[in-house]
C-alpha cells in the first residue's frame, strides 16, 4: 500500500512538472505576461509622443504661428521694427 502511495505521488509530480516548468508552462506564461505589460507601457509612451509630433506637424502645415514661434525661439529672429532685449540669467554663487 505504501509503494502505491509513493508511486501515485511520483506520477502526480511527473505530470505537474511540464505544467509548471516545461515549455509553455505557467512560469513561461507569467514571464510573457510581464514582458507584455512592459511593452504596452513603452507603446503607450510612444503613442503619446507621436500624438504630440503629429499635432506639431499639422500646426506647421496649416498655420504660421508655429513657424513664427520656432523662428523666434530657436533662431532668435525678430519682426521688423521690433527691439530684442536679452536679460542674462544670474548665476548662483556669483
From Swiss-Prot:
It is found in: Cell inner membrane. Its main location: membrane. GO terms for cellular component: cell division site; cell septum; plasma membrane. It holds the Pfam family DivIC. Essential cell division protein. May link together the upstream cell division proteins, which are predominantly cytoplasmic, with the downstream cell division proteins, which are predominantly periplasmic. Belongs to the FtsB family. This is Cell division protein FtsB. It comes from Dechloromonas aromatica (strain RCB). The gene is ftsB.
Amino acid at each position: 500500500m505504501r509503494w502505491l502511495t509513493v508511486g501515485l505521488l511520483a506520477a502526480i509530480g511527473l505530470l505537474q512538472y511540464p505544467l509548471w516548468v516545461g515549455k509553455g508552462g505557467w512560469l513561461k506564461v507569467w514571464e510573457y505576461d510581464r514582458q507584455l505589460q512592459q511593452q504596452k507601457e513603452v507603446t503607450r509612451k510612444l503613442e503619446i509622443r507621436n500624438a504630440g509630433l503629429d499635432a506639431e506637424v499639422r500646426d506647421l502645415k496649416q498655420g504660421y504661428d508655429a513657424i513664427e514661434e520656432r523662428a523666434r525661439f530657436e533662431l532668435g529672429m525678430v519682426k521688423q521694427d521690433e527691439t530684442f532685449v536679452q536679460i542674462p540669467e544670474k548665476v548662483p554663487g556669483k
